[in-house]
Amino acid sequence: MENSQELTPWQRLTIARMLERPTSLEYIDLIFDSFMEFHGDRAFGDDAAIVGGVAEFNGMPVTVIGQQKGRNTNENIKRNFGMPSPEGYRKALRLMKQAEKFNRPLICFVDTSGAYCGVEAEQRGQGEAIAKNLISMANLKIPVISVVIGEGGSGGALAMAVADEVWMLENSVYSLLSPEGFASILWKDSSRAKEAAEVMKITADDLKGYGIIDKVIKEPDGGAQNDITMVANALRENLKKAIEGLSSTGINELLDNRYNKFRQIGKFIENEDN
């Protein structure tokens, strides 16, 4: 494997998709204490593609939610390959609202190729569930931090990433759709996926440059699986500083900053001389 500074977007995507890539539950176990997982959306059922609950961090209670993939075929079937259904997003929203009620900071780990697009998910209101999360997260009166730890795919990722600060691990990706999908739609040729990955600007460094994310967390060469403790320690230190800073910010200022952060994404200024 090349030095991390020399990796192409496609190589980073390959690392992000590795079965060995550390999952949300692994980071939760290393970063937080006394994690207690909650289940169910109180409307339809539970979704194992999203895990969440209450934990202790730096002596304070926090709410932690993460999209969860599996390590093998059986686990991935149970977790639906990390593609959440409507009940998963509604479970996440239940935990977000509970965090707000008890004034607990919220930390989200994003790792999904996208929301589940099966017929049953559409029948249960997948679009509505995602949209409800977007508007609700924008208005949460608590500090919110989201970290893309693997794949950040489309609205399925954004539904857990409307946050005061959005971070990415160095070899994670965040995009509207997959390079394979992009190539199929734009060029009618999915074999040009590597080329699409270059064009789409899906890497942490690219997105940091565009102001879409706020921080890039370094990984060891070859990916986080080669030293998850190093990555977890870096996340812990950065979370401590960020939560302290956000907790000292007034609610109105917090909400205004969050709103303005997302309003700036995609903004451009035309040159009046041309």
Curated annotation (Swiss-Prot):
This is Acetyl-coenzyme A carboxylase carboxyl transferase subunit alpha. It comes from the Bacteria. Acetyl-CoA carboxylase is a heterohexamer composed of biotin carboxyl carrier protein (AccB), biotin carboxylase (AccC) and two subunits each of ACCase subunit alpha (AccA) and ACCase subunit beta (AccD). Gene3D superfamilies: 2-enoyl-CoA Hydratase, Chain A, domain 1 (3.90.226.10). InterPro entries: Acetyl_CoA_COase_a_su (IPR001095), ClpP/crotonase-like_dom_sf (IPR029045), COA_CT_C (IPR011763). Pathway: Lipid metabolism; malonyl-CoA biosynthesis; malonyl-CoA from acetyl-CoA: step 1/1. PROSITE patterns: COA_CT_CTER. GO terms for cellular component: acetyl-CoA carboxylase complex. One of its GO terms (biological process) is fatty acid biosynthetic process. One of its GO terms (molecular function) is acetyl-CoA carboxylase activity. HAMAP family: AcetylCoA_CT_alpha. It is found in: Cytoplasm. Component of the acetyl coenzyme A carboxylase (ACC) complex. First, biotin carboxylase catalyzes the carboxylation of biotin on its carrier protein (BCCP) and then the CO(2) group is transferred by the carboxyltransferase to acetyl-CoA to form malonyl-CoA.
